[in-house]
Amino acid sequence: MFAKYLKKPWIWTTEPTCRNFTRKHSVKGKRTPDIGQDLIKVFEHNGIPVRLTEKEECCGMPKLEQGDLETVDKYRQTNIPELVRLIDEGWDIVAAIPSCVLMFKQELPLMYPDDPDVQKVKQHMFDPFEYLVHRHKAGLLNTEFSQELGKVVWQVPCHQRVQNIGPKTRDVLALVPGTEVEMIERCSGHDGTYGVRAGTYDKSQKIARPVISRAKKMDA
């Protein structure tokens, strides 16, 4: 698991962007820990501090999509106080999964508009590449890339697109010399648990076919 990979919290500073960073643990720590580990390496390379939350639950997006509002609220009661505590210590929040970012940026604030703590978390939640763009604008991103990436096919996550932050992943990848980013702006069919449940798996595969087909044609 990703939490075991880190072994203990890391605390760094990101000045002069006046932002600190907390990486929100998520499903990627259990199923694809390498993604979280790679993100840590990228941030390390750029001198960005990283710390895992010590107490947390799922962001609640899968339960929200199933209409289980009681569990969503249960997760909120665990997550929000912990994140607010870290924010008050000077940290910002980043999650590797767009759905998690969207949950804290948009869904929970809409569900709890009068909760000041939910609104505070909203203001300090960032997509990882959005955060890197902030660093770049402040002149703090390490752009001394040693290897070209060639052609990169990027399927724009639906839950990232609706955050209205722009194609920040493309913007960062495009900084690497000799890199061509091809964007696919179609749904992957995954949608949280939709792509893994027995009752919806076949439908999710059908939705994903155009994305897979385009990726193959692009010959990345």
Residue map of PLM features:
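Iron-sulfur cluster-binding electron-transfer modules in prokaryotic oxidoreductases
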Residues: 1-220
